[in-house]
């Protein structure tokens, strides 16, 4: 069963962006638009983790944290806020949040922080089983190790995030805009060839010993991870 995450934010665009990104990475996602709705949903069907905005109507994120912790609930909580100051971070952590991420943020970082939160609440054997595989390509989001057969591949953060998205969606064509939004975040470049450059980097590294190509271009659309060209 996939991990269930409740996303709570009064900004619909943020909610939908997080829903798409988390769903693409294998999570089951539910949405709430404020703290009152979030607490009701948690009480009726507790999720595995919570992504929680601070500034919301009716009941803000910090009060949601306080109420949950006040009942002894240890639900993993990642707090989002538009204010990036020491006092704001301290307030969030003191209210009971496990981690803190200022807006705007790269979706890659949010996904990494969510994995870290879930690792801290799962037994070691569960964390060790998170390796993703396609053909002879293996990517482990916990250890951040990548292998092609027995060959270890060293990747930068952006290369890793791009490959992780592709391997999480095998044989599924991913549009250029979808990849840019998820890997580069909300402020992704709308022009230039950054994506093409990084796809080239990944191809060179994953094919360095003459292995067959796995990352294919779908002309006019985007890219796909598959054994043969589309």
Swiss-Prot record:
Would I find DNA-binding among this entry's keywords? Answer: yes
Modification 4-aspartylphosphate, positions: 48
Q: Where does the Response regulatory domain lie?
A: 4-118
User: Which GO terms label this protein's molecular function in UniProt?
Assistant: DNA binding; phosphorelay response regulator activity; transcription cis-regulatory region binding
- What's a BP term from Gene Ontology annotated to this protein? positive regulation of DNA-templated transcription
Entry superkingdom: Bacteria
Signals that turn on the gene: Autoregulated. Differentially up-regulated under different stress conditions, such as low concentrations of detergents and alkaline pH. Induced by low concentrations of sodium dodecyl sulfate (SDS) in a SigE-dependent manner. In strain ATCC 25618 / H37Rv, repressed during growth in macrophages.
What PROSITE patterns is this protein classified in? OMPR_PHOB, RESPONSE_REGULATORY
Extract the DNA-binding region annotation as residue ranges. 129-227
Task: Please name the PANTHER family in this protein's record.
Answer: REGULATOR OF RPOS
Look up the further comments and give them: Phosphorylation is not required for binding to DNA in vitro. However, phosphorylation enhances DNA binding and is required for activity in vivo.
Q: How does it assemble?
A: Monomer. Interaction with each conserved 8-bp repeat requires tandem binding by two protein monomers.
Protein's job: Member of the two-component regulatory system MprB/MprA which contributes to maintaining a balance among several systems involved in stress resistance and is required for establishment and maintenance of persistent infection in the host. Functions as a transcriptional regulator that recognizes a 19-bp nucleotide motif comprizing two loosely conserved 8-bp direct DNA-binding motif repeats separated by a 3-bp spacer region.
* Protein name (Swiss-Prot/TrEMBL): Response regulator MprA
Q: Which organism is it from?
A: Mycobacterium tuberculosis (strain ATCC 25618 / H37Rv)
């Amino acid at each position: 069963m996939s991990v269930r995450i409740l996303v709570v934010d009064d900004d619909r665009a943020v909610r939908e962006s997080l829903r798409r990104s988390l769903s693409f990475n294998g999570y089951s996602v539910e949405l709430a638009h404020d703290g009152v709705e979030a607490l009701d949903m948690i009480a009726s069907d507790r999720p595995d983790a919570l992504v929680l905005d601070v500034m919301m109507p009716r009941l803000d994120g910090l009060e949601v944290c306080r109420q949950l912790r006040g009942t002894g609930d240890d639900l993993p909580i990642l707090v989002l806020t538009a204010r990036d100051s020491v006092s704001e971070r301290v307030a969030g952590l003191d209210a009971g949040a496990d981690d803190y991420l200022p807006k705007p943020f790269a979706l890659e970082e949010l996904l990494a922080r969510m994995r870290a939160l879930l690792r801290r609440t799962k037994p070691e054997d569960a964390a060790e089983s998170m390796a993703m595989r396609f053909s002879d390509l293996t990517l482990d989001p916990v250890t951040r190790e990548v292998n092609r057969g027995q060959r270890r591949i060293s990747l930068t953060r952006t290369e890793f995030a791009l490959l992780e998205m592709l391997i999480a969606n095998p044989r599924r064509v991913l549009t250029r805009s979808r990849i840019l939004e998820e890997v580069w975040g909300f402020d992704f470049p709308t022009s230039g060839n950054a994506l093409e450059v990084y796809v080239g980097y990944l191809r060179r590294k994953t094919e360095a010993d003459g292995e067959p190509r796995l990352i294919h271009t779908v002309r006019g659309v985007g890219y796909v991870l598959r054994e043969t060209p589309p």
